[in-house]
């Protein structure tokens, strides 16, 4: 799908960006989130300079993204470790079953 121009409002300023039609809702949601963050920052920090507010918001969003990436990386590493442990457990159980079958002469097929 080709991107189409979309007009959005960010903190009272109009921006035209290209966006695929199927991602327009996500873009609007992101714009709403950014507007809310900027408004919250303006109230909390009493900073009135829009450029400063945008930079602070960008830093906050970047920090949050970095934290989420770290969580995802840690979760993936944890899952890989669990999978390795499960594989070892299964392999050991199969080896034990093979030894038991050899000793008793029974076949479980």
UniProtKB/Swiss-Prot annotation:
Organism superkingdom: Bacteria
Keyword annotations of the record: Cell cycle, Cell division, Coiled coil, Cytoplasm, Septation
Subcellular location: Cytoplasm
Keyword Magnesium: no
Gene Ontology cellular-component annotations: cell division site; cell septum; cytosol; plasma membrane
Residues of the signal peptide: none
Primary residence: cytoplasm
Pfam families assigned: ZapA (PF05164)
A GO BP entry: FtsZ-dependent cytokinesis
Coiled-coil regions listed: 21-97
InterPro entries, per database record: Cell_div_ZapA-like (IPR007838), Cell_div_ZapA-like_sf (IPR036192), Cell_div_ZapA_eubact (IPR023771), Cell_div_ZapA_N (IPR042233)
UniProt keyword RNA-binding, yes or no: no
Family to which this protein belongs: Belongs to the ZapA family. Type 1 subfamily.
Reported function: Activator of cell division through the inhibition of FtsZ GTPase activity, therefore promoting FtsZ assembly into bundles of protofilaments necessary for the formation of the division Z ring. It is recruited early at mid-cell but it is not essential for cell division.
HAMAP family given in the database record: ZapA_type1
Subunit structure: Homodimer. Interacts with FtsZ.
Protein name: Cell division protein ZapA
Species per Swiss-Prot/TrEMBL record: Salmonella arizonae (strain ATCC BAA-731 / CDC346-86 / RSK2980)
């Amino acid at each position: 799908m080709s991107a189409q121009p979309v007009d959005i409002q960010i903190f009272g300023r109009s921006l035209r960006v290209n966006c695929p039609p199927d991602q327009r809702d996500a873009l609007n949601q992101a714009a709403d989130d950014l507007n809310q963050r900027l408004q919250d920052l303006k109230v909390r920090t009493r900073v009135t300079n829009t450029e400063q507010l945008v930079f602070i918001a960008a830093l906050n969003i970047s920090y949050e993204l970095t934290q989420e990436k770290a969580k995802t990386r840690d979760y993936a590493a944890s899952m890989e470790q669990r999978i390795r442990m499960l594989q070892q457990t299964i392999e050991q159980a199969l080896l034990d079953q093979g030894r038991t079958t050899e000793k008793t002469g029974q076949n479980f097929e």
